[in-house]
């Protein structure tokens, strides 16, 4: 028994369309099939192109994405960029959409280096932006506010020294499980970026493959490995 999460959950989705719950579904479906480059057979109900197109069609005027309505949200924008990142150099429509999304995130960075969702600056929005920039081969520590505080500085704002966890909002007193989980994988994404790797690349060859970094339209390559360092040019 059991179900194949890639076949039954994505390209031959048994529970309606992959985006049944909204754009979140399409984003994570695309991330899932790309973790190991899973092939989608001819005749499948849904293709990679279907997932990409759904994400592109749901970008809002401000350049970001949202779970509902027409006001862009940093969390969903970050996730959408993460899903589209592998297609940036080969698809002009994807490139244009991602560039707009990155601009939206950059413009939303506060003086402290964090981002907000629903009017509240918080850990999770900041974490998703970090993962998005890392996925694009852009050093999150180089993405700064006008005052010079980086996204990594913004994330550190939510660290709870008394518990080792992360707060949802800086005014909270108790660490939050969701905030801590997202902060930890944002830190992992940053570490992978430093090694020339990608958070969502689960291929067996990921540690030895050549990594292509996409930074504001420029393409850089570096031998990826445990000790590899990746330096992205100016404009990243």
Language model segments and positions:
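Flexible internal linker/loop segments at domain or repeat junctions
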Residues: 103-109, 113
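Extended hydrophobic/aromatic segments used for targeting, binding, or gating
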Residues: 145-159
């Amino acid at each position: 028994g059991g179900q194949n999460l890639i076949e039954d959950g994505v390209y031959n989705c048994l529970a309606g369309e992959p985006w049944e719950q909204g754009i979140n579904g399409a984003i994570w479906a695309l991330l899932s099939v790309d973790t190991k480059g899973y092939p989608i057979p001819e005749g499948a109900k849904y293709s990679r192109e279907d997932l990409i197109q759904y994400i592109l069609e749901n970008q809002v005027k401000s350049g970001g994405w949202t779970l509902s309505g027409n006001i862009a949200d940093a969390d969903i924008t970050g996730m959408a960029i993460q899903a589209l990142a592998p297609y940036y150099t080969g698809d002009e429509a994807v490139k244009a959409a991602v560039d707009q999304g990155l601009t939206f995130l950059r413009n939303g960075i506060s003086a402290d280096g964090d981002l907000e969702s629903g009017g509240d600056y918080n850990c999770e929005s900041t974490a998703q932006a970090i993962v998005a920039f890392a996925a694009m081969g852009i050093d999150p520590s180089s993405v700064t506010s006008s005052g010079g505080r980086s996204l990594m500085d913004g994330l550190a704002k939510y660290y709870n020294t008394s518990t080792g966890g992360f707060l949802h909002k800086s005014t909270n007193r108790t660490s939050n499980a969701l905030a801590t989980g997202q902060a930890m994988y944002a830190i992992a994404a940053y570490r992978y970026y430093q090694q020339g790797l990608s958070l969502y690349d689960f291929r067996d060859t990921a540690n030895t493959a050549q990594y292509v970094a996409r930074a504001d339209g420029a393409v850089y390559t570096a031998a990826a490995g445990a000790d590899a360092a990746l330096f992205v040019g100016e404009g990243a």
